[in-house]
Amino acid sequence: MNAVIVDAKRTIFGNQNGLLKPFLPEDLAAPIIRCLSRKLEDQVDEVILGNATGRGGNLARLSALQAGLPLSVPGMTIDRQCGSGLEAVRYACSLIQAGAGTMYIAGGSESSSQSPFSERARFSPDAIGDPDMGIAAEYTAARYSISRSMQDEYALLSHQRSRNAHDEGFYREEVVALGELETDEAFLKTRPIEAIIPRAKPVFDTSSGTVTAANSSGIADGAAALLVMEEEKAAALGLKPVLRFIGSAVSGIHPNFPPAAPVVAIRQLLHTHDVTPDDIDLFEINEAFAVKICVCSQELGIPFSKINVRGGALALGHPYGASGAALVTRLFYEAKRRPDCQYAVAAIGSGGGIGLALLFEVLA
């Protein structure tokens, strides 16, 4: 059985303690669930959501109920830290492939502003190494010889792409408004990013570091989710799918180098399905740090022209548990604009040194 993506939505993304501070994770997720399930409420098999910094409980079930889905629709919440939202999509697709169901809403929701935790979780035993993510980015830059100028070059490109995507209305079609909130917080002010990036000072290794606030993503609040169906079910409902799930790969690397984790996952994914980076038209790789994209480009031989073509987290921010679902949401809309594309990949790395990658065939 084939799993396909037939719809995708996200909220705006807001800075931590910014526009979306009053919203709990379920407040962010419920409007998306409501939008994706319209006229299909009683056919949804389950809601699966990723979340990394929440209050516990079962966010997916809570959000499904808040969205008004029937009491019979269960929910499951996944924590793979930054990979949570992408894992939710992977899990839904795998359930369909296994014949366990025919329709899922899968994604993630995060409110760092409402998190009850003042300290981050541990990702690895101290004996192995459990660096903060910024320090891990510095370790990765040093190990793979990624210079400050390489990181800044990509950061500027990503900011420009995001601004252009906003100005051209591409982000607007992704977004479900939260009341009157329908514009990402990043675009409410104009910043001279071309001047800010080269002037920014290292923040994690102040003596000789290369990772700055300007070539790193900001912590954000937001949600994203997709309507995942069995392909024949979508056809029976008269819905046109855009992406067909082909397969996935998950891998672990040394926890000191999590920004490099997508490299191993993507390499494994492509090898399993006998394709090369040249065969892939679009890559969405989470921009927690510019060094992550630079490493993926360098180690896999992927030109920047194929990666995050409408920008990403460097401008919009990184709502941990939602970011992976936002990657697939962006692929969904970009694939609709590029009917000549054949394959697309979404990938993310997370704390503890875990990489996750999904391969899709473009059907648009």
Swiss-Prot record:
Identify which residues the record assigns to the active site: C82 (acyl-thioester intermediate), H318 (proton acceptor)
Q: List the disulfide bonds.
A: none
InterPro entries the UniProt entry points to? Thiolase, Thiolase-like, Thiolase-like_sf_Thiolase, Thiolase_C, Thiolase_CS, Thiolase_N
Give, as one word, the top-level EC class. Answer: transferase
Which is one GO molecular function term here?
A: acetyl-CoA C-acyltransferase activity
Top-level taxon of origin? Bacteria
**What induces this protein's gene, according to its Swiss-Prot or TrEMBL record?**
Repressed by presence of biotin, under control of BirA. Probably part of the bioY-yhfST operon.
Q: Name one GO cellular component term.
A: cytoplasm
What EC number(s) is this enzyme filed under?
2.3.1.-
Which keywords annotate this record? Answer: Acyltransferase, Transferase
Keyword set includes Acyltransferase: yes
The family annotation for this protein states: Belongs to the thiolase-like superfamily. Thiolase family.
- Function comment: May be involved in fatty acid metabolism.
Q: What is this protein called?
A: Putative acetyl-CoA C-acetyltransferase YhfS
